[in-house]
Each structure stands twice: as structure tokens, then as C-alpha cells.
Amino acid sequence: MAKRKSHSARWLREHFRDSYVIQAKAQGYRSRAVFKLQEIDTRERLLGPGRVVIDLGAAPGGWSQWAAERVGERGRVIAMDILPMLSCPGVQFIQGDFREDNVLAELQNTLAGCVVDLVMSDMAPNMSGMAAVDQPRAIYLGELALAFAQESLGPEGSFLLKTFQGEGFDALYEVIRQDFSRVRIHKPPASRGRSREVYIVARRSRKDNGGG
């Protein structure tokens, strides 16, 4: 218990001294995670005017903020989370578990037939500090996000997933490679150095293009 308290205290000290945290507050963003998305988007050009985006595990909304800025008035950003989220300009929010039928029905009504260009997931489990517990949970969330993306994306859609290196990562990565034509792994500078988190970018789903 003392070790966990010490770890939490260290994390808090680092968090409030973090230059990305300071920048996020100064620029009006809700979390430092926005800079990870910015860095990936700069390289991959996932977001652009008129695109339709679904943001899984969106709260507190940093990714949704950036996405709304990038897609503009002609685009759409639909944020989903089991947690509440404050309203955000240019973002439609659905609170609930995206596996549940009523939530999926609300999503379909919100999309109103629009083709989804990007599904992005910044979901992570509540960390216990025990890798044997946290890693399987993280991989499971990644599998859920992938299944959602496979069902939701348009024929040339893209998928952005935060996950963690460790047991189960290679298997998840291989499944993603089988379903998308181009897959890359990113470790953006805004990720903390000792963190095992990485971001998988998968593009051009083969689902509706005759691929396997």
C-alpha cells in the first residue's frame, strides 16, 4: 500500500510539472492527450475537413476537441464514453457503453447514414499498478474497439488505437494487420518515456473492398 501511495504522489508531482499539461491548460484543451493525437495526425493526416469521426472513451474530451477543429463545420465528431463529458463545440456526445444495443441505436440515429472515416480509441482500464491485471484489461479494450471499428468504418476508413505493449499485444497487432491494408505503430513524443503505451494506426479497411 505504501508503495502505491508513493507512486501516486510521484505521478501527481510529475503531472503538474509536465510541460504538456501546462500547454494544454494554456491552449484550452482538456487533457495533455490532445498533443499525442496532434503528433500522430501531423504524420498520418487522419483528420481533415468534412470527415466523420467516432471517438471511443472520449472523456474528458481532448481528442474530440482537436478532431472538431480539424474536421470543421462540414465534418462530424461523435464522442462516446460511459463517463459523463462536458459539452464541446462541434462534438455530439453519447453517454453509454458502445456494446449495448440502445447506445448503438442512438449512434446510428446520430450518424443518419453518414459514412464513418475514422474510429479512434484512447480507452484504458483503471490501472491497478499490477501488469498481470492491467495488461489483459488493456488488450480486451483494444479488441472491443477493433470489433467496433470493423463494423462501423466505411470502405476506406481508418482506425487509431491506444494500447500497451506486453502480453497479448502481438496477437492484437496481427489481427489488425489482417483487416487493414496499412498498419503503423507510433510512440508520440507526448507519451511519457517509461509508459508502455503505443498507438496503432490502421488504414484502408479491406472489409468492403474484396479483401480478406
Curated annotation (Swiss-Prot):
Residues that, per the record, bind S-adenosyl-L-methionine: G61, W63, D81, D97, D122
EC annotation from Swiss-Prot or TrEMBL: 2.1.1.166
NCBIfam families: PRK11188.1
Cited InterPro entries: RNA_methyltr_RlmE, RNA_MeTrfase_FtsJ_dom, rRNA-MeTfrase_E, SAM-dependent_MTases_sf
Protein known as: Ribosomal RNA large subunit methyltransferase E
Residues the record marks as active site: K162 (proton acceptor)
Locations listed in the record: Cytoplasm
Role according to the record: Specifically methylates the uridine in position 2552 of 23S rRNA at the 2'-O position of the ribose in the fully assembled 50S ribosomal subunit.
One Pfam family cited in the UniProt record for this chain: FtsJ
UniProt entry keywords in alphabetical sequence: Cytoplasm, Methyltransferase, rRNA processing, S-adenosyl-L-methionine, Transferase
